[in-house]
Amino acid sequence: INFLTTPSIEFASMKNWEGTVGELLDYMFDPTMTWEDLKWIRKQWDGTLTVKGIQNLDDAKMAAKLGADAILLSNHGGRQLDRAPVMLHLLSDIKKEFKKDYEIHIDTGIMHGADVLAAVALGAQYTYVGRAYLYGLMAGGQDGVERALEIMRTQMVRNMKLLGVNSLDELTPKHVRFLNRQ
């Protein structure tokens, strides 16, 4: 890849934006949103409602109380909020407070098949793998994405064998150990 003498990479989603990516993010995220807005959205939308960006137990409880069908634990990849709670640590605390069938998703820190297994073992019904997907996309387009996902699948299968489990349903919190949780 020749970044020095070829034109800069352009993102289709940024063609009409004059500022930087950081300025676009500042523009897109609305700091005036409140729980009242979630109440309004719930009244307007009768479909499944998942609230993204949950970073503590109180917010998880509030989202559920206001009618969210699911919560998505996220520090938005940790790039902007690199001092936010570790979502896998938060997951185990939140799962203790919610019914078994309440949907909990996690999208931060999933970079290896073992991360998927840890999230499932701690109670997540869904994990999101944006970073691996994007790295694969940047490196090799669709083939790169398929390869990245295949690597994660292989890691999951290998780690399940090492843990002595045959299905995701067999995973429990006893299969997860945290390093230096404070």
Please provide the spans of the model-predicted regions.
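Active-site entrance/lid segments in N-terminal catalytic domains of soluble metabolic enzymes
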Residues: I1-K61, K65, G77-Q80, H89-S92
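Conserved, mostly hydrophobic/aromatic
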Residues: I41, A63, I71, A119, ...
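Glycine-enriched alpha-helix->loop->beta-strand junction motifs that scaffold or abut catalytic
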Residues: Q44-T48, A64-G78, F98-D101, G123-T127
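Generic beta-strand/beta-sheet core signal
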Residues: K52-I54, L73-H76, D107, V129-G130
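Short, well-ordered secondary-structure micro-motifs
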Residues: K61-A64, D82-A84, V116-A118, A139
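Glycine-rich, proline-tolerant flexible connector loops at the mouths of alpha/beta enzymes
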Residues: N75-P85, L134-L137
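Alpha/beta catalytic cores of nucleotide-metabolism and tRNA/nucleoside-modifying enzymes
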Residues: H89-D107, M111-Q182
